[in-house]
């Protein structure tokens, strides 16, 4: 009887430890993701009035937060400071809870509609960087 109790206790402890380990691994895969977008604006007025408000609203609606905005003109943006190499004219960095959430936003109807407008007034270069 005592052996059965010991085996049952060990099995229960193993399941508990395994569950904690799986939860920990899952948490590590859901790191924040930063979407770095370098922008060369060709029509600042139209970009600021037609594109920027739409894309900013779509980021917010999809759970992203814009944490950095730099470059010439628009929405209180500060200048991009050259450290090494030639800096882009404008940079926007939103952060997302996960790569999946960022990708869902990128393929959303709101973002696609905004991007059609943005492509008329700017050229974009974007890449995602995992957070720690």
Per-region residue spans from a language model:
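A periodicity- and composition-biased signal for non-globular, repetitive helical segments
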Residues: 8-10, 112, 121
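Short, conserved catalytic or adaptor-binding loops enriched in Gly and charged residues
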Residues: 57-58, 116-120
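A signal for specific C-terminal beta-sheet/loop modules enriched in small/flexible residues
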Residues: 1, 64, 89, 121-124
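Short S/T/G/P-rich N-terminal loop/turn motif that feeds into the first structured element of a domain
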Residues: 5, 14-107, 130-132
């Amino acid at each position: 009887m005592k052996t059965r109790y010991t085996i049952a206790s060990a099995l229960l402890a193993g399941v508990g430890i395994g569950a904690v380990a799986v939860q920990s691994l899952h948490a590590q895969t859901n790191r924040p993701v930063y979407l770095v977008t370098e922008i060369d604006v060709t029509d600042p007025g139209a970009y600021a009035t037609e594109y920027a408000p739409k894309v900013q609203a779509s980021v917010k609606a999809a759970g992203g937060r814009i944490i950095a905005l730099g470059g010439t003109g628009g929405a209180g943006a500060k200048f991009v400071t050259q450290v090494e190499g030639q800096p882009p004219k404008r940079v926007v960095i939103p952060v997302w809870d996960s790569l999946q959430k960022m990708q869902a936003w990128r393929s959303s109807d709101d973002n696609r509609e905004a991007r059609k407008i943005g492509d008329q007034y700017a050229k974009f270069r974007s890449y995602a960087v995992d957070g720690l």
